[in-house]
């Protein structure tokens, strides 16, 4: 509060409270008299902050949100190019997307919960693994440590922004987190086994069979990861569709299966059981990612049938066939000789069997007639409920990353 000012000679006097009255009059013009009186204890910075909020235009601020301002009806929701408010999660249109999000949360696990003691001892033992077995472990950790990062980048930088459905976006966020967990798992394995981290993480630059798969995937994310890229035309919508086929049907649906089969086969033989346990969890996560992506692709086809023309079908077919060939080359590189009860020829048959499934899942003709599955146990493990342990077929605490036994 201002005080009375009086000069000692008595020639000048200011009435008590005069300065306070003047201050109130000036400030009240900006923030309101009542508010000012209540906030006399506020600092100048707080007064400025409150004044700025008084000037906030709510309508202008909310106009920046994606979609309209009206309440959302189910029929207004679409997979791409939706104009409804994307911040209104409910009502759900795609219940399957929300269920996958819930299932993913229930299946949460963390790499450090897996005991790597036996793996470390086996890896350090010069007689513990053959050279071919060591090659398989290193090649797969090298490929997967990069591949899951590529998938995560594609989700975060492109797919999340371009899929215009909130329940699907909710699952995409969960998937991106799971990709981070998978990269964490590979790092945990590499660190636990005291591998040369530079060699493993740079393998996609140095090993041709790994580099070609990475380069193939990256070309499909280059354009849509541009912040200026927008869907809304036939060509840009098709570009997004190509990306979804590349990353869900090929990267996660084909490129991962040679490595999964090799590492899980080691686990079945009681070798590298900690690494194999983590790969089993990752396979279960990736199976759900794959199924989600296929559902998204098929829903886009239903809502936009003009996109799925003869040209697009041929492109999608070629993408899956190219991916299959790249994975066959990778199998030959990682298995120059028979190992773990399998060889490159058997893996080629398996990959063609998988490719037929991917083609049929998005409504395309199978291109490898007469192929069969030489590894039926892989189908069994993929088809299990998430809470089941393939090797013991008993209920486990997968929700808390409970350890699996490979006996």
Language model regions located:
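N-terminal intrinsically disordered, low-complexity tails
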Residues: 6-54
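Short, flexible helical or helix-coil boundary motifs
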Residues: 27, 34, 44-47, 53-56, ...
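Membrane-interacting alpha-helical segments
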Residues: 50-69, 133-135, 304
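Amphipathic alpha-helical packing elements
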Residues: 59-123
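Long, low-hydrophobicity ectodomains and other hydrophilic envelope-associated domains
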Residues: 127-129
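Non-heme di-metal
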Residues: 131-407
